[in-house]
Regions:
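Nucleic-acid substrate recognition interfaces
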Residues: 1-184
Length: 184
């Protein structure tokens, strides 16, 4: 069998977090800011298309986000990780792409009560399995219940809160194992 040299296996792991009360407050802020930025970017993209008949890319929206964060009325956006906010913009942009390419539903504005509270990070995340903790930007080291460990490069970490109020970290790992060709 031959290996596909450019593709490797991606595995997902989910851990239940045990944050301190201060970390819970910071996570709630991050959930709210990410939801706000998603809705802001969706609104801006729709209005720009309706008014100027042009589409804003995720890069354009991230540049606009930098300006928004400097506005006196939006300084509170600086209290959370910029990476999470940019990931919200990328998620919204991805929803638009799927709408046009795959004919899925038109992207909807996020609601605090209807939608799941999540935020994503791509860089600067570290796991310490000896002490059962994960380092999340701005939030710091958060304890978690470790039922298994992993080896490989961390891709994306998604922090979420369930409807029961429990916090989880889902992490995608590139374990470096090549994907095998299909057997015929």
């Amino acid at each position: 069998m031959y290996h596909k040299a450019d593709k490797t296996m991606i595995k997902g792991y989910k851990y239940r977090l045990n944050p301190t009360p201060e970390q819970i407050v910071q996570m709630e802020k991050t959930f709210g800011c990410c939801r706000y930025v998603y809705n802001w970017a969706l609104d801006l993209k729709i209005k720009t298309y309706q008014g100027e008949k042009r589409s804003l890319s995720a890069v354009d929206l991230c540049k606009q986000l930098t300006l928004l964060k400097k506005d006196d009325n939006h300084l509170w956006l600086n209290e959370v990780s910029n990476e999470c906010l940019q990931q919200s913009i990328r998620c919204m942009d991805s929803a638009f792409t799927k709408f046009f390419r795959e004919h899925t539903g038109f992207p909807k504005f996020k609601s605090k009560h209807r939608d799941k509270n999540v935020f994503k990070n791509v860089n600067s995340v570290k796991f310490d399995f000896e002490n059962n903790r994960v380092k999340i930007p701005i939030i710091g080291w958060v304890k978690f219940f470790a039922n298994r460990s992993f080896d490989g490069k961390i891709g994306t970490i998604t922090v979420s809160r369930s409807s029961t109020g429990k916090f989880y970290a889902s992490v995608l790992i590139d374990d470096g194992i090549p994907i095998l060709d299909d057997i015929q």
